[in-house]
């Protein structure tokens, strides 16, 4: 039922080049540090536009399928990352706010660590 679906958007600016951000976003070792173990999520690539867009079909046990889209844009000497998590069941939407917020914080820490 479309009326019961929700979406979240997170926008973060990082003081790193688009290439550095893309590397941390797509490198398996980096992913395991900022996103954590796969747990009960099945994430399958839907769209990849290197250096710009990564879109995933996201399915978590006990939930309907949803869509995660990460989009990058250069911003001066840094990069803006926009993460949209859409087609979420309303009952799980706020749980994903708590899921993505610390992971995006760890993503920023992973970028800073790589720049040292």
Where are these regions (language model features)?
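Tryptophan-centric aromatic hotspots in well-structured domains and transmembrane helices
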Residues: 22-25, 58, 99-100
